[in-house]
């Protein structure tokens, strides 16, 4: 059975005087597993925060059976798209409302990931973090198609321009990943997982390293990353969900 050893979460706006359009789901027990997520409302449109809140509220309502079917991720995104589309019923100006969403469900056999947009999932591997999801941005699409190398786009515009999000107007394109525990667990049976919005991972990627003891501890990681973000001055709303899980029975942890 999967156990939650520790977790740490933060979410704060780019500026204290403006609304935070990120919405966060801290690790939540769902059946025998744990569900966590970040939704980043697309800030250039009215209703961005309502769209991200709508996505998280739907995830909170889910029962364990929602994650069992082979098309579970698709069904979840379809239902959230319906709810985001219906936001126009409460305010016609929300017609263009959109949000990204990245969620992880750590179940009995592995971690199921559903991803739309440009939040990211990272896993700790040895002494570094490995990016698991792909950004749904124009830059990443050009790289995937072999038209450019990452170094060639470093100074080009459009880095944060999305080609997929959950919206009434956009065709839904999502990434689904399943990671078995025997693929990702450390030798002690633990898994360290991180979900970050773009406001959090851009400062991380400027110097993607902390002491291994910091990577092992969600609270220390969150505190250090937050200090870095504040020191560099936030460029967007900033959100992090960091967790450490184990597949070992509780008694084995003290052997």
Regions found by a protein language model. Give the residues of each.
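PP2C/PPM-type serine/threonine phosphatase catalytic domain
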Residues: 1-255
